[in-house]
Amino acid sequence: MASLKDMRVRIASTKATQKITKAMQMVAASKLRRAQLAAEAARPYAERMDAVISNIASAAAGSPGAPVLLAGTGKDQVHLLLVCTGERGLSGAFNSSIVRLARERALSLMNQGKEVKLFCVGRKGYEQLRRTFDRQIVENIELRSVRQLGFVNAEDIAHKVVARFNNGEFDVCTLFYSRFKSVISQIPTAQQIIPLVVEAPAANAGPATSYEYEPEEDEILAGLLPRNLAVQIFRALLENNASFYGAQMSAMDNATRNAGDMIRKQTLIYNRTRQAMITKELIEIISGAEAI
């Protein structure tokens, strides 16, 4: 059995850990609100941008001059998985859930005889994926030095992806990130971004509105598609940021509660042990006095 001194050290250590987790919870809570507002503000813009491009793309579908980002290469052999995760841990299953979804997709494609390449954004995803797919990772970008996420960060990633596509390095690109729903719910999401997936109009939708475009649809799409790619990546980064702080806040809250439970149990054991030792000493003193 541990000595009273060891028990006191253990209780003090647990209390110190509880202070750290409580502080991290409060920091995450303070940053969550701003990150959540940024993610929610980006959604309408990204969705509207996607809708506008889908409308133009529907008119340009089948055109021999359609941009390759829309039409694709005509093949489905090489897949690039753009996996966006966080730079830090202590956030529950936030990073591992995104990695798990990407890993499952990669293994499924490889079982179908497809070639898979990985483009990692974020240190944690890279560290986990390289254990299994070290040879498939073609690029890794870390954002640890970025204090405030900006559109320029997404543009940089989009430029690298488009450059690889134009070089013929892949046929299909899928974006993986975590969509923020609430503090306790973040949804791992996979979204194909190259070639662009044009959603068909709903069966119960009314007649489609006819638009006239100037310049031609193909020319408009050639300028809009690369920007839309950056917009979708920027949205994913913002969603990830909010999801990270939500997951961290929840994880640190659970850790703080667990530390409190552990402190109570350790204190109870300490008090019982101390009481038993005092009782034993009293019995020894009384027995010695009676013997005299």
Curated annotation (Swiss-Prot):
GO process terms (BP): proton motive force-driven plasma membrane ATP synthesis
UniProt keywords, alphabetically: ATP synthesis, Cell inner membrane, Cell membrane, CF(1), Hydrogen ion transport, Ion transport, Membrane, Transport
Cell membrane as UniProt keyword: yes
Main location: membrane
Domain of life of the organism encoding this protein: Bacteria
Record-level GO cellular component terms: plasma membrane; proton-transporting ATP synthase complex
One Pfam family in the UniProt entry: ATP-synt
Subcellular location: Cell inner membrane
A GO MF term: proton-transporting ATP synthase activity, rotational mechanism
UniProt keyword Transmembrane present: no
Membrane topology recorded in Swiss-Prot or TrEMBL: Peripheral membrane protein
Family the UniProt entry places it in: Belongs to the ATPase gamma chain family.
SUBUNIT field: F-type ATPases have 2 components, CF(1) - the catalytic core - and CF(0) - the membrane proton channel. CF(1) has five subunits: alpha(3), beta(3), gamma(1), delta(1), epsilon(1). CF(0) has three main subunits: a, b and c.
PANTHER family: ATP SYNTHASE GAMMA CHAIN, ATP SYNTHASE SUBUNIT GAMMA, MITOCHONDRIAL
Entry function: Produces ATP from ADP in the presence of a proton gradient across the membrane. The gamma chain is believed to be important in regulating ATPase activity and the flow of protons through the CF(0) complex.
Protein name, entry field: ATP synthase gamma chain
Gene: atpG
